[in-house]
């Protein structure tokens, strides 16, 4: 399951890089080159792969696999302060049963008519 999350992160970041390139937006690199040239497409993808690896190593990212428990400072109400509902006095509604054509209602069931 964890491997699938890495693949999803990787696909998402590749999609982001392709979106930036298709829209012609500038993309700043974190490489330590002193040239003023724009990085090539492969360099951008390589940097994105590095970022995906770094993000995958961080276990606090729960985008696709949320934690099962969360810290909270609130307390639950005690049981005696909750309202108890009386369900013994409920009223049931009886609805007539409708049978399809060529069927009769016999002994609580729809049965086919015998000619």
UniProtKB/Swiss-Prot annotation:
InterPro entries: Secapin (IPR020128). One of its GO terms (cellular component) is extracellular region. Residues 1-24 form the signal peptide. It comes from the Eukaryota. Disulfide bonds join 99-110. Transmembrane segments: none annotated. The keyword Cytoplasm does not apply. It is found in: Secreted. Residues 25-90 form a propeptide. Keywords: Antibiotic, Antimicrobial, Disulfide bond, Fungicide, Hemostasis impairing toxin, Immunity, Innate immunity, Protease inhibitor, Secreted, Serine protease inhibitor, Signal, Toxin. Its main location: secreted. Induction: Up-regulated in the fat body after injection with bacteria (B.thuringiensis, P.larvae or E.coli) or the fungus B.bassiana. GO terms for molecular function: serine-type endopeptidase inhibitor activity. Expressed in the epidermis, fat body and venom gland. Serine protease inhibitor which exhibits antifibrinolytic, antielastolytic and antimicrobial activities. Displays antimicrobial activity against bacteria and fungi. Likely functions in the innate immune response to microbial infection and possibly in the venom, as an antifibrinolytic agent. This is Secapin. It comes from Apis cerana.
